[in-house]
Amino acid sequence: MEPKLRISSDIVAIKTISYLSELINTSDIDNISANIAANMITHHIDYDYLASRIMISNLHKNTKDCYYETVKTINENMDNILMDKLIKFAEVNIDFIKETIDYKKDYTFKYFGILVLIKSYLLKKDDNVFERPQHMYMRVAIGLHLDQIDTDGS
């Protein structure tokens, strides 16, 4: 079980409410809440954990939880940026990859770490992020070893 955070989530909620409007979506509310929590890190370091958890939760809410579906979506939206061999490997090994990826590990990032990943390393088009940190790690690991991998499953 995660240790209890020593912060006031009420303060973050009250400050977030002041930014709400009728047309705002839940993803924007999450981003506002995460930014408010991040701005309170100087009051207590646990606000960092709150901010990062909100960011990761929002990222998970807006991305697919299947690696194969993620790489297909990336390729469809980003002009076939990924190698066919990587996509084929993901398709053939869908169950193994699903068992291997532990999305809870995404929650180990601190706020500024996840911000850097989102801004610079996770594949996205415009402001639409397609992958989670664990997807990025899997994409890099498979890509590094593609020449040593049998993609037809035999």
Please name every model-derived segment.
Residues 1-154:
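Extended catalytic cores of very large enzyme megasubunits
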